[in-house]
Amino acid sequence: MFKSWIKRTIFIFLIIGSFALSFVFAQSYDSDRMIPSFDEISPFVDSNRYTHQKAETYAFNTQDPFLDALEIETDSGLLSVDLASLAFQIENSRGYIWSSTIDYDREGFANTFKNRVRSALIIESFNTNNNNFAITEENLFEPGTTITVTEITNGFHAHITFGRTKIKVGLYVTFDSGILNVYIPQDEIVEGDVFKLSTIKVYPYFGAVIETETPGYVFLPDGIGALYDYKASDPSIGSNYQKEFYGRNMSYNLETDLSNFQNLGKSIYAPVYGFVHGVNQQAVFAYVTEGAPYGRLNLYFPSRNRGVTTVFSEYVYRRTYSQPIDRLGNVISLLQGEKNKFDVNITYHFLENEDANYVGMANTYRNLLDIEHTTSNLNDIPFRMDIIGLEKRDGLLWAETEVMTRLEDVSNMLSDLSLSGINHTYVTLHGFTKDGVTWSPPYYEKLSSRIGSSKELTEIKEASTYLLFGTEYMKASNRSRGFTQYFDLAKKISDQTYRYQSSTDIKYLLEHEKTRALLNSSFDALSSYDVDGYLIGSFGNMLYQDYQNSDSLNDQITWMQELLSSKDEMIVLYDAFDYMFEVMDAYFDMPMYSSQYIVFDDTVPFLSIALSGVMPLFAPYANFYPYARDELLRLIDFHVYPSFILTNRSSKFLQDTSLEFIYTSSYRDLNDAIKTYYHFVNDALKYVYGEKIIARDVISNGVVRVTYENDVSIIINYLDRPYNDQGTIIQAKNYVVKNN
């Protein structure tokens, strides 16, 4: 429909001698009520929450080719290998030399540092003869280390025996189809009796930069994405950046309330990273295809690393942990017995010219995911509305039930939205059983008659695009049924249970097998209801080892993928990590920011670019926007759709429940905001609904142009003043849609 309209319009414009076409937002929902957070233009305050212009300063080679290297002819070109360190060099089509080390032979670098930056691997191990399990670090220049290299097709295979610990590691490096692949199989890691492997750092100085010798930046998948520009040493930076892929490992802590065991900042949602040497010149995008659940990402800053900036991945095979020995809180330190079992596999993708930037990395990642989902044929973007049905609280003598929204109320909401032109809706019912939102998990058997009937449910399905039940099968409330605390709870390595405490209940993480059984039985019990599918809590972002049954993180990922892919119902997940992307039909609570650490220079929408055109992406709830217009512009910029959590009754009735943090939810209070917000976003994104983002350019700091596959671009002006883009005026905190 849009394409045919464009053709007619272009024909008219050609008659009058003009080809330019643009659409400027004009509010299509009339309301007498002012919405201050939307209607008032707040000052633009620049920070690393935005993306900034990057100079395309030329990047020169900073080192010469290796001397006396092993030169391996591959299908993708010459792979030069320094046999002493297993460092490699590859020359790209622009004549730029990519190297896994730096120009280390210079004044000021100690020999110990030179050895580190040259080494392909750096390992840490625990000394079991030491009561404190002292850490020993080794690189390939440790005295007594032996390396045996064998040429294989398109690369080499190295057998390494480290000199001090006698730990043996096998390393495969191949260069094929323009991709460098590094592989460490678990069955080629052999430990001795005394030293036990802790971690392996893999090519930790690949793409490293000394001070400001090379222009460009590091890309980190922190939250939605972040950039760190190469720069001179800053003494104020106190520590390097380190974060585990997929969030902190919960299996080794002693925390009795895991609500307190949070990530510091945003999670890493995908095991990727990259570095750009000369913007739009050359870049490397790294993708960890095996080993990510036990991996972590490191960024070393120049002030903490002798003037060198480098980004790399590291893999954890074994940890120490504290074991409680009595009820007084006394503990002893123990070493994990069996090492974690996993292979390490990293692919490095070489990007050039217009692809040598974070957008090129996102597009590369999208192609590697190779996920194709169908989108609806509606012309407008979707709107997500999460509905709270029942919620429970403790009363003086017995539990009290608050009926926040009946199914009849939901139908009325949908009718009202339809009159305002909002017809593409994802409706999720939370608290649809008698135990309410908080106390139901993990047991869902039937719809509570207190919120409505099956017939009313069918009416909602007919009025909405998709209707979902909101469920949770990993976290089990002590106020619920379907499990026993004696036999069904997962255990940490210390034999403690995983617990979350709220004001009204305690939730436990269940054994993996129990979670599978509960999900299957729930789907069977609810199959008679006319819904499209399920929003499943925790499956998207909750990884934990079940030491009670020796289930690893890799085991959990495998069974979750297999379980959900076997279901015919629509599956939606919250805040999900990349290992679940293939089994999802929509993404709820897409991260919209990076951690915004002071060391970061930019926030970039890497994740939403990678998933654009792949599946619908929905933002966290817009109920709580303090500066709505800024947040809505971000939705348009990142191609993410608006969401609200709604009730019929006032949110004051959630007081003294576990949902009392929801301070505004009444549809009556929010309906003007819903309609205004939706149409503001829809009037931009409806022209590119279901399309992939192919480019994102910062025209000027605070002004961004996003280009789509269908040749439509949207210019977003975050500034508090109008911006003139070659004759096109974009009003303050507004946008223009253009057909190119």
Regions from the PLM with identified roles:
Residues 422-433, 466-471, 524-546:
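Short acidic catalytic loops
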Residues 1-5:
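N-terminal secretory signal peptides that target proteins for export/translocation
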Residues 378-459, 467-517:
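Aromatic-lined carbohydrate-binding/catalytic grooves of carbohydrate-active enzymes
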Residues 27-377, 714, 719, 727:
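N-terminal accessory beta-strand-rich subdomains and adjacent acidic, glycine-rich linkers
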Residues 7-26:
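Sec-dependent N-terminal signal peptides of Gram-positive bacterial secreted proteins and lipoproteins
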Residues 347-426, 660-691, 696-698:
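Terminal accessory/anchoring regions of large secretory-pathway or extracellular enzymes
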Residues 74, 81-92, 269, 275, ...:
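Active-site-proximal substrate-binding groove within the catalytic cores of carbohydrate-active enzymes
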Residues 83, 92, 186, 204, ...:
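Glycine-rich, histidine-containing beta strand-loop boundary motifs that form or position
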